[in-house]
Amino acid sequence: MQNELVVKSNQVIEASYRLSVVEQRVVLSAIAKIPKMSEVSDDEIYTVSVQDLQALGVHEKTAYRDLKEAVNRLYERSISLDIDDKLIKMRWVQRIEFTDNQGIIALRFSKDILPFISNVKANFTQYMLSEVSKMQGAY
C-alpha cells in the first residue's frame, strides 16, 4: 500500500479545505486505490483499513477509533475550488460504511470531486503514499 502513487489535480492542492492529519491520510489512502488513467464512476467504493493507517503512522492502539472518527468528520467536510471564475463548494465523499469487526471503512467519493482525483492528465501533483507518513501537520 505504501508504494502506491497519489495523483491530485493542482486545483485540489490549491483549494480551500481543512482536513485533520488522519482525515488527509484516509483521503490519500483511498485516492491511491483509484486505478490510474482510467475512468471512474461515483459508484466505486474504496476501502481503507486500520493497517493502511498504521502504515502511514497512525498509532496501533488508536487506529480504528481514529479512522472511524476521521471518516465521520470527512463525511461533513467540503472543499471549495475556483473554477472558471466561479467558487464551487463540494463534498469530499457521498457515502461511508463501517465494518467494525474487520477494522475497515468504505467510502464513495462525491461525483463532483472525482474529476480532480481520478484520471488527471494535466496540471497535477503526484507523490508516493509512503511520503504521507512523514507529514507532521495536515499539509
What are these regions (language model features)?
Residues 1-139:
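Charged, alpha-helix-forming regions
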